[in-house]
Amino acid sequence: MAYKIDRKTYAQTYGPTAGDRVRLADTELFIEVEKDLTTYGDEVKFGGGKVIRDGMGQSQVRRADGAVDTVITNALIVDWWGIIKADVGIKDGMIFEIGKAGNPDIQDNVDIVIGASTEVIAGEGHILTAGSIDTHIHFICPQQIETALASGITTMLGGGTGPATGTNATTCTPGSFHISRMLQSAEAFPMNLGFYGKGNSTNESNLIDQVEAGACGLKLHEDWGTTPSTINSCLNIADKFDVQVCIHTDTLNEAGFVEDTINAIAGRTIHTFHTEGAGGGHAPDIIKICGEKNVLPSSTNPTRPYTRNTLEEHLDMLMVCHHLDSKIPEDIAFAESRIRRETIAAEDILHDIGAFSVIASDSQAMGRVGEVITRTFQTAHKMKVQRGPLMQDSDRNDNYRVKRYISKVTINPAIAHGIDKHVGSIEKGKIADLVLWKPSFFAVKPELVVKGGSIVWSQMGDANASIPTPGPVHGRPMFASFGQSLIKSSFTFLSKNSIDQNIPNKLSLQKKCIAVENTRNINKSHLKLNSKLPNILVDPQTYEVFSDGELLTCEPLDEVPMAQRYFLL
């Protein structure tokens, strides 16, 4: 006779199931479990007197015969493709299966075999997401990497050489010498890394040299001169070598206006950084470029979301980042031309309707590397409060909105940069870069980060305590952050050409190097849940933004969630 259990008790024991709802941190965002792949009455759970014991939930199957290395039990997966409850099996550092774990000798419909070689991570009552991807990194200091990892980022793409003046302003690792040194430096960090070369050169040989040296993309930045001719040269090489081009356009409109940049791009695929313009770009109307099908538009997090402090903090940030002088009126005018409340307010809404597709940091160069995920969901909260449920959602849940926003920091940046075969979502066959969250800390502080199948970061108490939980509890690096485990758990992304030229061996790289691919045959329609192509017009006098004839405007927030109640120091 079946034993009946009430929903509350079930959720407390095994985590929420289909039809249950979960609040995300202290936001007004609520998700509802769409499907449960575990089997009622046959759930697996570890612990004294629990299921995963020899002859019960643990089978006699050897690892060589199919038992997984790790199982995350009863997790609530939040990904672009769904919000479901499932067990997740990991083997050889990869996602082996998503479904029902257990012992096939005594349980039906087992997808993930637990054996004596299987470790268990308890996912009950936790949310599981893919490790996030930040594609706008200024590699100014190595300490950024630990900060990013602690926030749930597992892949960082960008450029730089350290705290050089050029790196402080631009995400470029210029030339083969610097690219080689940064690739060698990447060996030390428990993070997937990739580096952009400098794309600003009309001599295409300079660009080829950098791609052949290992650059996984090229970056055009106005501080190096983003003219129509450099745009054309850079895209020519990108098309030839299958790497992505990222662009920070000409704020001062010296070499042309946004229409000239669009003409120079000529329908070729390109990733536009801080597409609203406060981070840089044709003033005041770079934002209209998000209506182009070949443009993959992203934001950086200093303008996410629009609050009462957003405008005030930007001027000083901008002056420092771009090596401007407050004693020179023209420098001040340059900075002020980029900061417009009207376009920042419109940016919130363009994200909410899926017209802006990616959010990244702009680390230490106006953006905060540890706040990408937090600010993404602060924006989602703001739009829920100000605009109500999306058409695809209901009064019961915000599932579509949450999936739209999680896509901006996971699968979409992966697609944009040709690494989505490997990372960016929780799917069978991808690298097991996974983040486990308590719902009350979702998008703020991960409970645990898995990197390449091993635990790389976790909330951890006093190391001298008798159990793991006594305070002070804070995020700390775990074993996969050290030694050869680090080397095996993290990866470096390079151009295919550089791998073909044996660059990893020439540089004595030990991390597995993976080629980026399929960056040139994509467009905005390939980006998940964020592919809208609005017709954008910007009033040159008032800076008001219109999308398909509708004025896009919203008020700044006075108070955001996921903020001071989580960060006391």
UniProtKB/Swiss-Prot annotation:
Modified residues (N6-carboxylysine): K219
Note accompanying the cofactor annotation: Binds 2 nickel ions per subunit.
Boundaries of every Urease domain copy: 131-569
Keyword Cytoplasm part of the UniProt annotation: yes
Entry EC no(s): 3.5.1.5
Annotated keywords: Cytoplasm, Hydrolase, Metal-binding, Nickel
Listed transmembrane segments: none
Post-translational modification: Carboxylation allows a single lysine to coordinate two nickel ions.
Active site: H322 (proton donor)
Reactions catalysed: urea + 2 H2O + H(+) = hydrogencarbonate + 2 NH4(+)
Binding site for Ni(2+) 2: K219, H248, H274
Cofactor(s) needed by this chain: Ni cation
Class of enzymatic activity (EC top level): hydrolase
Residues holding Ni(2+) 1: H136, H138, K219, D362
Any one GO biological process: urea catabolic process
Pfam families per UniProt: Amidohydro_1, Urease_alpha
HAMAP family given in the database record: Urease_alpha
Family designation: Belongs to the metallo-dependent hydrolases superfamily. Urease alpha subunit family.
NCBIfam families registered for this protein in UniProt: PRK13206.1, PRK13207.1, urease_alph
Subunit structure: Heterotrimer of UreA (gamma), UreB (beta) and UreC (alpha) subunits. Three heterotrimers associate to form the active enzyme.
Protein name: Urease subunit alpha
Source species: Prochlorococcus marinus (strain MIT 9215)
